Amino acid sequence: MRFVLLMAETDHYEKWHRVGDAERAEVFAAFGAFSEAVAARGTIVAGEGLADPGEAVTLRPGPDRAVTAGPYTESVEQVGGLWIVDLPDLDAAIEAARLLPESWSIEIRPATDG
């Protein structure tokens, strides 16, 4: 079963630019542990870090699909990345997600088949 894991943290980008090499190494170690846990029970389909929300553009609803600078919603909690994993069930996805940095909120959402 495929799941999308969205990783969010309050003021994520400001924090990331301030942390030192040791803190970044801890984050990457957590990613490694997560990757190993998923590989033991399933597959990582994709995983990406996302650029700063200031680099986003959004197409708004409506017939002319206006393009605006920035993310679709303003929020202090920013999505910093995502994983798409194929695991046996939600419990396995939760177990793997617990290995990601504990300062982040992780939304786990099943992917639809069609």
For the regions a language model picked out, list residue spans one by one.
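Conserved, structured core segments of small domains
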Residues: 1-114
